[in-house]
Amino acid sequence: MSDSIIVNIETPQSSKRKSQISKRYRVTSEEDRRNLKEKVISARLESLDDDNEQQPIGSRGDEEDNDYNDDENEIVYTTPVNKKRLFIAREKKKNEKKSMNLNFNDVLEKSYLETFPDHVPTYISVQSKPSIFPPRHFCSICGYIGAYTCKQCSSRYCSIKCFNYHNETRCKGSIYT
């Protein structure tokens, strides 16, 4: 707490209370700010260097590897596991892995579409009724709903801005006139 200054603040809502001003707010001159900024940057660089430091491949160094224990006396006792539950869990994992790795092309290959008769719907021959809603028309420039149509090339647009852009760059009818 030696890095901070204690200041007494009086507010109308509360009585006297003590607050601490951090070290960075006490810096008053521009030179002190620059020095403090350099210290912070150098501290960050040193911590990054420490994090990224690696031993060269093949050198073991003088220190022993503390992560590796060669003690055969340490035995870890676990609680007994129901073998039937363990077997069921393994089977579930096998089945999940098999089904999760299939993409659509694999599914089509495994479905043997050529073996089905023509009247049976498959992934390729599936059909649906026409929509009861009218078709949507989208702006050829921005993708919003296009309420207007170009008279020259019958492309859709939604606003005057899109129409101007369409006339400048995309209108096929204006090329021939």
Swiss-Prot record:
Cited Pfam families: zf-HIT
Biased segments, Basic residues type: 15-26
Alphabetized PROSITE patterns for the sequence: ZF_HIT
Gene Ontology BP term (one): chromatin remodeling
Biased amino acid composition, Basic and acidic residues: 27-41
Disulfide bond annotation, renumbered to this chain: none
Positions that bind Zn(2+) 2: 150, 153, 166, 171
Region (Disordered): 1-74
Signal peptide: none
Amino-acid positions noted as binding Zn(2+) 1 in the UniProt annotation, renumbered to this chain: 139, 142, 158, 162
Keyword Zinc-finger included in the entry's annotation: yes
Presence of the UniProt keyword Zinc-finger in the record: yes
One Gene Ontology molecular-function label: zinc ion binding
Zinc finger (HIT-type): 139-171
Cross-referenced PANTHER family: ZINC FINGER HIT DOMAIN CONTAINING PROTEIN 1
Protein name per Swiss-Prot or TrEMBL: Zinc finger HIT domain-containing protein 1 homolog
Protein species of origin: Dictyostelium discoideum
Gene: znhit1
